[in-house]
Curated annotation (Swiss-Prot):
Keyword Zinc annotated: yes
Binding residue positions for Zn(2+): H79, C81, C95, C98
Family recorded in the similarity comment: Belongs to the YabA family.
Function: Involved in control of chromosome replication initiation. Inhibits the cooperative binding of DnaA to the oriC region, thus negatively regulating initiation of chromosome replication. Inhibits the ability of DnaA-ATP to form a helix on DNA; does not disassemble preformed DnaA-DNA helices. Decreases the residence time of DnaA on the chromosome at its binding sites (oriC, replication forks and promoter-binding sites). Tethers DnaA to the replication machinery via the DNA polymerase beta sliding clamp subunit (dnaN).
Annotated protein name in UniProt: Replication initiation control protein YabA
Pfam families: YabA (PF06156)
Lineage: Bacteria, Bacillati, Bacillota, Bacilli, Lactobacillales
Species, as recorded: Streptococcus pneumoniae serotype 2 (strain D39 / NCTC 7466)
Observed phenotype of the null mutant: Increased DNA replication initiation rate. Reduced growth rate.
Length: 105
């Protein structure tokens, strides 16, 4: 291999290294962007989980209160089922639709 071929090979290798370096820099920039997005999403996820915990803690209390209100309306002699809601139950007779609603899990 003469000096010119050696110089050309070294020059080609140098050019390939520059292209590879540019690719690595682009990958680093993309990775930095992804890490920042990931950090933001983790923070948002953490806040949402915290908020969900607060909402779930309040939910059983509200559900119990609503269920008690519906039972009280039924005991007062009114239908709570979808078919006859708000109508007075004649002689406080049982309604299977209301019972299903009141005692479902």
């Amino acid at each position: 291999m003469d000096k010119k071929e050696l110089f050309d090979a070294l020059d080609d290798f140098s050019q390939q290294l520059l292209v590879t370096l540019a690719d690595v820099e682009a990958i680093k920039k993309n990775l930095k962007s992804l890490v920042e997005e990931n950090t933001a999403l983790r923070l948002e996820n953490s806040k949402l989980r915290e908020r969900l915990g607060e909402v779930e803690a309040d939910a059983p209390v509200k559900a119990k209160h609503v269920r008690e209100s519906v039972r009280r309306i039924y005991r007062d002699g009114f239908h709570v089922c979808n078919d006859f809601y708000g109508q007075r139950r004649e002689q406080d007779e049982e309604c299977m639709f209301c019972d299903e609603l009141l005692y479902r899990e």
